[in-house]
Amino acid sequence: MRLIRTLFVAALAMGTSLAHADDSAAVQRLTGLLNKAQTLTARFSQLTLDGSGTRLQETAGQLSLKRPGLFRWHTDAPNEQLLISNGEKVWLYDPDLEQVTIQKLDQRLTQTPALLLSGDISKISESFAITYKEGGNVVDFVLKPKTKDTLFDTLRLSFRSGKVNDMQMIDGVGQRTNILFFDVKMNEALDAKQFTFDVPPGVDVIQE
């Protein structure tokens, strides 16, 4: 279940920047950037470090999102996994284990950071205290959950030239998951079939 924890999961702005502590202004700025992408596709690289900075895992793959609440996250071999949501439930398929886990999608943004990119962004101010800084074409956000029942203590989200660039999730013991997005494309037509999953024959199914 490592991918669900990390997905439902940071570049720093260089040069002169202006910091904003007004939560309402930060919400408005973040909402405006997220609203630009009704669909999004990207390649990604993901690096997880422990509290001392030791590498725990490094992966790469392809991401597709469609608002509201649809996403597909495919991690390449040798740690291949496929994570899909149709907005109501989530499938996590591990071809090496020949196993798929099916869960109800937790709509709370603090439990599923991926919903920041694909879900109901009107709930952002309910879930997070937000600050941001802006310099040149870079906008960096820091999101702190307002409740303690969360997968992370801090979420950092950065945009460059209006496109999402990277995400960092830091948990209570200092473990960091850094996700860098590249080849980002927005508002292209996406086949709805990629956001559903047909269980292959012979695969074990676990309902949670």
UniProtKB/Swiss-Prot annotation:
Coiled coil: none annotated. Residues 1-21 form the signal peptide. Keywords: Chaperone, Periplasm, Protein transport, Signal, Transport. InterPro entries: LolA/LolB/LppX, OM_lipoprot_carrier_LolA-like, OM_lipoprot_carrier_LolA_Pbac. Gene3D superfamilies: Lipoprotein localisation LolA/LolB/LppX (2.50.20.10). One of its GO terms (cellular component) is outer membrane-bounded periplasmic space. Pfam families: LolA (PF03548). The keyword Protein transport applies. One of its GO terms (biological process) is lipoprotein localization to outer membrane. It is found in: Periplasm. Belongs to the LolA family. Monomer. PANTHER family: OUTER-MEMBRANE LIPOPROTEIN CARRIER PROTEIN. Participates in the translocation of lipoproteins from the inner membrane to the outer membrane. Only forms a complex with a lipoprotein if the residue after the N-terminal Cys is not an aspartate (The Asp acts as a targeting signal to indicate that the lipoprotein should stay in the inner membrane). This is Outer-membrane lipoprotein carrier protein. It comes from Pseudomonas paraeruginosa (strain DSM 24068 / PA7) (Pseudomonas aeruginosa (strain PA7)). The gene is lolA.
